[in-house]
Swiss-Prot record:
Subcellular localization, as worded in the UniProt entry: Cell membrane
Listed GO MF terms: G protein-coupled photoreceptor activity; photoreceptor activity
PROSITE patterns cross-referenced by the UniProt entry: G_PROTEIN_RECEP_F1_1, G_PROTEIN_RECEP_F1_2, OPSIN
Glycosylation, residue list: N18
Bilayer topology annotation: Multi-pass membrane protein
Disulfide bonds: C137-C215
Name used for this protein in its record: Melanopsin-like
Positions with biased composition (Polar residues): 409-428
Family listed: Belongs to the G-protein coupled receptor 1 family. Opsin subfamily.
Keyword hit for Membrane: yes
Expression across tissues: Expressed in a subset of retinal horizontal cells.
Keyword vocabulary terms for this entry: Cell membrane, Chromophore, Disulfide bond, G-protein coupled receptor, Glycoprotein, Membrane, Photoreceptor protein, Receptor, Retinal protein, Sensory transduction, Transducer, Transmembrane, Transmembrane helix
Ranges annotated as spanning the membrane: 66-86, 102-122, 139-159, 183-203, 233-253, 287-307, 323-343
Length: 500
């Protein structure tokens, strides 16, 4: 039932102190009431909204409706897109890997962000105010903080995973498993929860913001407690993770550049293949980098607004300046599925395979689908880490050829079991280890690799005058218990021999 009210009364003569009678007429669709209320002085006909526990802002109605429509589109896209990411990455055997667990977790956080934020924001925008009460406001803001922080921490974990995959490939093989990736994700959620709960216990608060149709933590109140929470929140969930991400990608770039230079000097066919695999890993790292950059761009306007208010300049902020950045930040939930649908070939093929109705949109070729099906049908015992080209240096040439590419890889060549995964540590796949080739790649024309570095032999196998002992290093060809068709979760750069 719609209601409105208006003031009606007698015009009082100037100076007539006995004129205190007035009437408030409450108009409904079926009834009329006349309520006697005291008035002082002359009255005029004007409208009053009914009292409400939450404040409102004086903006045109269409502003609420436009923002509500945008957030509804963002929510629908985020729910559908991230649900597809979770479904496809969990369904496809080639994508069900330890490294991709971080991508799935990011999609879960974005999915929950879309589910909990967009419908409520849209409904409040239709009413042009927050209508759900104090506790729902706190819960709404808590969910936004929790899932937003979790997304940022997950992106940090993805950057670290890509960094290890390229700069420390064999270390990643031996150390990263699904169980350990799951443990990292548990830490991510607990860390996010730790920064989302304090407003419930009096450190800052969750309150309506902007156009008063959504809620967030209180960054507008200029008190020491509120300012301390806001500053620490940005330091530990935005700036420090941002620094870690930047450091990881700087290390990735440096490794790729150095590896390319050293491989050109070695001029070995197998090392060129290794470099190509590393380049493939770099392509995946670039996809993750695009997701990270877009996430940071989405949250940067909101960060600027919050930090501006924290610095004591909240009087410069308008309701629009608070609400629009909040909408942009919530839109970060749709970047992940869109980017992977455009740039991740295996993801596109998997969607086309499991959701045929989307094939025309994705434009996946039939031969790619057949190739994906055949690769997914082969035995899961497929080699993903094979090193048949090893590097070596003589003691006399060490000064010239013991750069990072040669020296660090050689350091682990004598300890071949450092390349094994946990699935092989129990000896269940010993038969899959094939010690086939000996060291064959030459850096100089008359040297082969030494595990101890104590002697050398020439290319024909004869001992040189300097040699006291020749040690040949068998190089294992290792087959992993994995579902990945090309070892994508392990970094194609892991075909390197060694790599601490």
């Amino acid at each position: 039932m719609s209601h409105h009210s208006s003031w009606r009364g007698h015009h009082c003569a100037p100076g007539d102190i006995n004129c205190t009678a007035g009437f408030k007429e409450s108009l409904g669709s079926r009834n009329y009431k006349l309520l006697h209320v005291p008035v002082h002085g002359p009255t005029h006909s004007h409208h009053h909204d009914p009292p409400h526990p939450f404040p409102t802002v004086d903006v045109p109605d269409h502003a609420h409706y436009i923002i509500g429509s945008v957030i509804l589109i963002v929510g629908i896209t985020g729910v559908i897109g991230n649900a597809l990411v979770v479904y496809v990455f969990c369904r496809s055997r080639t994508l069900r890997t330890a490294g991709n667990m971080f991508i799935v977790n990011l999609a879960v956080a974005d999915f929950l962000m879309s589910v909990t934020q967009s419908p409520v924001f849209f409904a409040a925008s239709l009413h042009r105010r927050w209508v759900f009460g104090e506790r729902p406001c706190e819960l709404y803001a808590f969910c936004g903080a929790l899932f937003g922080i979790c997304s940022m921490m997950t992106l940090t974990a993805i950057a670290a995973d890509r960094c290890l995959a390229i700069t420390q490939p064999l270390a990643l093989v031996s150390r990263v498993s699904r169980r350990k990736a799951g443990a990292v994700l548990v830490v991510v959620w607990l860390y996010s929860l730790g920064w989302s709960l304090p407003p419930f216990f009096g450190w800052s608060a969750y309150v309506p913001e902007g156009l008063q149709t959504s809620c967030s933590w209180d960054y507008m109140t200029f008190t020491p407690s509120v300012r301390a929470y806001t500053i620490l929140l940005f330091v530990f969930v935005f700036f420090i993770p941002l620094g870690i991400i930047g450091s990881c990608y700087f290390a990735i770039f440096q490794t790729i550049r150095a590896a390319g230079k050293e491989i050109r000097e070695l001029d070995c066919g197998e090392t060129h293949k290794v470099y190509e695999r590393m380049q493939n890993e770099w392509k995946m790292a670039k996809v993750a980098l695009v997701v990270i950059v877009l996430f940071i761009i989405s949250w940067s306007p909101y960060s600027v607004v919050a930090l501006t208010a924290t610095a004591g300049y909240s009087h410069f902020l308008t309701p629009y300046m608070n609400s629009v950045p909040a909408v942009i930040a919530k839109a970060s939930a749709i970047h992940n599925p869109i980017i992977y649908a455009i740039t991740h070939p295996k993801y596109r093929v998997a969607i086309a395979r499991y959701i045929p109705v989307l094939r025309p949109i994705l434009r996946v070729k039939e031969k790619d689908l057949r190739s994906s099906f055949s690769s997914g049908s082969v035995s899961s015992r497929r080699p993903t880490l094979t090193s048949q080209c090893s590097l070596g240096v003589s003691m006399g040439n060490a000064a010239r050829a013991n750069g990072r590419w040669g020296k660090t890889r050689l350091s682990s060549a004598s300890d071949s079991d450092s390349c094994w995964t946990e699935s092989e540590a129990d000896g269940s796949s010993v038969s899959s280890l094939t010690f086939g080739r000996r060291v064959s790649t030459e850096i100089s024309t008359d040297t082969v690799i030494l595990s101890s570095g104590s002697s050398v032999s020439n290319a024909s196998g004869q001992k040189s005058e300097r040699a006291h002992k020749v040690i040949s290093v068998p190089v294992p060809s290792i087959t992993f218990e994995t579902d990945a068709a090309d070892g994508e979760s392990l970094s194609d750069g892991k075909a390197l021999l060694g790599g601490n």
